[in-house]
Amino acid sequence: MRLLLLLLIAGGLTITSCKRKGCTDPTAVNYSEKAKKDDGSCNYTPFIQLNGAATTTINVGDVYNDLGAVANNADGTSVPVATDASNVNTSVAGSYIVTYSASNEFGTSSIQRTVNVIIGQSNWEGFWTVTDNCGGAFPLNATPEITAGGGSAEIVIDGMFSIAIDPVPIILPNGLYIASGGTCNATIDGNQITVQQQVYDALGLGTITYSGSGTMNATGDSFTIDYTYDNSLPVIGGAGSCTATYTK
């Protein structure tokens, strides 16, 4: 009986002493699934962290200022970070990826940032040239200026119309000449523009009621609006719909 007990104890000690040692951290490059006891041998690629948010948004045409990233070894020593922002194209709306990487003797770590380039309010602002198929019944100004409205989702088209009606006896003896008249208030949502119904009063001689909607292109230098209008001015009055293209 004593011999059997000694054999059991010896066997238990042998089993205990044979437990496999190694790296038990799944994040280490040398992690061992078979290891039951960590022996402090774990090795790691650099720990890398973004400066700033993982997602950033800028308007088309803006300068992208990259915030970079930092990396350290497991012992706290710093590691140089390589940045690849070659994919970012600020001249075209879209989502782009910036990749950061850092290496040591155990391998390479990487992390990414998403840069969203969008059509924003500033892309709508400025002087534009208009081409259209509207005709005299909806006499758009060929060179309006767009300015920011009261909020970030509002813009104003200054000098919406350009009207030239020669004198007509009795009806309009002095004619009507407005080089740049009226302001159009519109709302924007990214590359979308909406012109709610509004009325332009042409010096009390008639009105132009209109509304519309449209879209800006991905490069922020052209947009199109489909208008619906009803013009009560003498000589050029009429109702209908047309399309205008604004370009920079």
Where are these regions (language model features)?
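Short structured motifs
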Residues: 51-53, 67, 82-86, 209-211
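Disulfide-stabilized cysteine-rich extracellular repeat microdomains
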Residues: 28, 33-36, 40, 55, ...
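Ser/Thr/Gly/Pro-rich, low-complexity flexible regions
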Residues: 120-248
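Serine/threonine-rich, repeat-prone extracellular segments and beta-strand-based repeat modules
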Residues: 74-115
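Bacterial Sec-dependent N-terminal signal peptides
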Residues: 5-52, 107, 114, 120, ...
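Solvent-exposed, low-complexity, repeat-rich "mucin-like" stalks and linkers
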Residues: 46-76
